[in-house]
Amino acid sequence: MAIHKEVSFLAYLLVLGMLLFVSAMEHVDAKACTLECGNLGYGICPRSEGSPENPICTNCCAGYKGCNYYSANGTFICEGQSHPKNPKACPRNCDPHIAYSKCPRSGGKTLIYPTGCTTCCTGYTDCYYFGKDGKFVCEGESIEPKACTLECDSRLHT
């Protein structure tokens, strides 16, 4: 009887381990990314900016969609309304109530110039990439850097 309990327990652990392994593998994107074909001009990655001591100059209309804007005392003011790939025509006045923003991707620069192995696949999520002609190309698809192949990304016109 004790042997059956041990076998059942080991079978249970084996099934549990297989389930954990399969769920972990679903999060791994095995797709290799392509090399840049030379047409990405720049990217916009909305970042958290300002602080209660060093306020920013913006308004809800001009603020980036997905970023939340707060007063100096931490009160939520609004979510930004302007999307980087299709910016709204907004007044350039500063809302005196807005002191800082919180955006999904907080570190690094807002305006980036892709080089080397940057494609839509390797570009960071929450970043928007534009061609050298200034037209929107794609949103980044990678949370972490990925390996690249020698093929060209069909979304980047050569």
Swiss-Prot record:
Pfam families: Prot_inhib_II. GO terms for molecular function: serine-type endopeptidase inhibitor activity. InterPro entries: Prot_inh_I20 (IPR003465), Protease_inhibitor_I20 (IPR051391). SUPFAM superfamilies: Plant proteinase inhibitors. Sequence repeats lie at residues 29-86, 87-146. Keywords: Disulfide bond, Protease inhibitor, Repeat, Serine protease inhibitor, Signal. The record marks 35-36 as: Reactive bond for chymotrypsin. The record marks 92-93 as: Reactive bond for trypsin. Residues 1-24 form the signal peptide. Gene3D superfamilies: 3.30.60.30. Disulfide bonds join 33-121, 37-117, 45-127, 57-94, 60-78, 61-90, 67-103, 120-138. Belongs to the protease inhibitor I20 (potato type II proteinase inhibitor) family. This is Proteinase inhibitor type-2.
